[in-house]
Amino acid sequence: ADPFLADLPGRFLFAVTDATGAVLTEPVDAAYQALTPTSGVIRLAGLGMPCARDDAVAHLLERARLFLTHREGPRVWNIRDLPADSPVFAGLEPMPVDPAPPLTPGPVGGDLVAGIPLAMLRATHLSALVAITDDVVITPWRSLVVPSGAEFAADLEEAGFTVTESDPWARLSACTGAPWCARTSSPTMDLALESAARLGPDGPRLHVVGCERACGAPTLDHVLVVDPHSVDDILSADGALAR
């Protein structure tokens, strides 16, 4: 362990992905994308360089150390916020990426992508999972992949998972909000829970946040609902009150 790396901001993200680059839709800071069983590329802020698989972890950690050394103060949280001439980017070249889109709720062959409302696993969720599987894959998109889970979609939906794209929770998310975040008085998650019961299947993706920082915002197109204090504030942003 390297104690120096303990100073990395909580929003600093590493990623490891395969040739599809699926997780690179997210705002990761430092990533390794495997292109063959033994080699791939290091990616930072639209730049990259070839890297052997066995060297990837050491290289990612070294870039993280450079970030801590050269950022201009503790309020610089992410590599993408650094100037283009930062030593963090030494040796990297422009390297476009065309990642696969995020997984959405529903069956994928015999497997099932099960969305987790507000990314909060509850006892009912876990009880349903242990009844059908010993293994799940956690995604970066507030969901799980349940191997061979497609045939159990109805059971998982009853337990509170989102298993279709028509479920309101497939297009609704929220930051932590009050009372857990001192930056806002808006109870974002409570309001999102109340709103979900009144949202229809159609409409824009909504992300409810307590302030302009917009923590947890999805990378896909969405409507940002900032500092709401009633369910109507969210439904107005959705257009539901006008329909």
Where are these regions (language model features)?
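An acidic, glycine-/histidine-flanked metal-binding catalytic module
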Residues: 35-103, 127, 235, 242-243
